[in-house]
Curated annotation (Swiss-Prot):
One of its GO terms (cellular component) is large ribosomal subunit. Keywords: Ribonucleoprotein, Ribosomal protein. Belongs to the bacterial ribosomal protein bL32 family. GO terms for biological process: translation. This is Large ribosomal subunit protein bL32. The keyword Metal-binding does not apply. It comes from the Bacteria. One of its GO terms (molecular function) is structural constituent of ribosome. InterPro entries: Ribosomal_bL32, Ribosomal_bL32_bact, Ribosomal_zn-bd. SUPFAM superfamilies: Zn-binding ribosomal proteins. PANTHER family: 50S RIBOSOMAL PROTEIN L32, LARGE RIBOSOMAL SUBUNIT PROTEIN BL32. Pfam families: Ribosomal_L32p (PF01783).
Length: 60
């Protein structure tokens, strides 16, 4: 049966877990709409790469 030969110390465990972290989403300023939006995604107003490709939400 597979059992660890030694107890994993808190330091060893925490050093391994230092790589588990959140990264901030990439955000860019869209000059067409004047809003900030995430890269490689359609903005809330329906623009992608400066071109209108989708209808905006009806709530606006």
């Amino acid at each position: 049966m597979a059992v660890p030969a030694r107890h994993t110390s808190k330091a060893k465990k925490n050093k391994r877990r230092t790589h588990y972290k959140l990264t901030a989403p990439s955000v860019k300023f869209d000059e067409t709409t004047g809003d900030y939006s995430r890269s490689h995604r359609v903005s809330l107003k329906g623009y992608y790469k400066g071109r209108k490709i989708a209808k905006a939400n009806a709530a606006e």
